[in-house]
């Protein structure tokens, strides 16, 4: 049983790999010698052509229908959205390698540095969302909703847990 030790298995593996034969299921491809694979035709009908799609045919297939365009136009007119740009400056903490030399001995250490990234971000702001945010702020402040303001209707805000008993003196 000592014949099948780890040294013999390692030797057999080296012999198989050096002989140019590869075990089943292993392909010896590198990134630079990959060949292109042609697609096979799975139909026997000679009228069907299996040519790769060109840019014109792909773009012709993707054109939206008139129903899609109408729904997009309706959506844009009802929501009244705008693209709002704002500054979103971020502070990043990174480790940068610093090379320090004393006479002829050099060593590299990594120090934490802070990088400020000034960016301009954009977000889509819709009129409906702004109205909903205003309504939530009014409710949190304890004010009545705008549509019921003149009818002397007052309700407690549903967002907050309001203690109706008040603080106890104990």
UniProtKB/Swiss-Prot annotation:
Residues 1-20 form the signal peptide. A motif (Cell attachment site) lies at residues 30-32. GO terms for cellular component: extracellular region; microfibril. Associated with fibrillin-containing microfibrils of the developing nuchal ligament. Keywords: Disulfide bond, Extracellular matrix, Glycoprotein, Secreted, Signal. One of its GO terms (biological process) is embryonic eye morphogenesis. Pfam families: MAGP (PF05507). It comes from the Eukaryota. Glycans are attached at residue 76. Forms intermolecular disulfide bonds either with other MAGP-2 molecules or with other components of the microfibrils. The keyword Secreted applies. It is found in: Secreted, Extracellular space, Extracellular matrix. May play a role in hematopoiesis. In the cardiovascular system, could regulate growth factors or participate in cell signaling in maintaining large vessel integrity. Component of the elastin-associated microfibrils. Interacts with TGFB2. Interacts with BMP2. Interacts with FBN1 (via N-terminal domain) and FBN2. This is Microfibrillar-associated protein 5. It comes from Bos taurus (Bovine).
């Amino acid at each position: 049983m000592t014949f099948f030790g780890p040294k013999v298995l390692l030797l057999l593996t080296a012999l198989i790999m050096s002989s140019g034969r590869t075990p089943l299921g292993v392909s010896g491809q590198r990134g630079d010698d990959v060949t292109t694979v042609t697609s096979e035709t799975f139909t026997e009908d000679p009228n069907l052509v299996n040519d790769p799609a060109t840019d014109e045919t792909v773009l012709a297939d993707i054109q939206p229908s008139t129903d899609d365009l109408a729904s997009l136009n309706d959506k844009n007119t009802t929501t009244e959205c705008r693209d709002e740009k704002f500054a979103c400056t971020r502070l990043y903490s990174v480790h940068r390698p610093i090379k320090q030399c004393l006479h002829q001995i050099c060593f590299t250490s990594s120090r934490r540095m802070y990088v400020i990234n000034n960016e301009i971000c954009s977000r889509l702001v819709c009129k409906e969302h702004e109205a909903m945010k205003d309504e939530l702020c009014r409710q949190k402040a304890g004010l009545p909703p705008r549509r019921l303001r003149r009818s002397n209707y007052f309700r407690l805000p549903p967002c907050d847990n309001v203690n109706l008993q008040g603080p106890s003196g104990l």
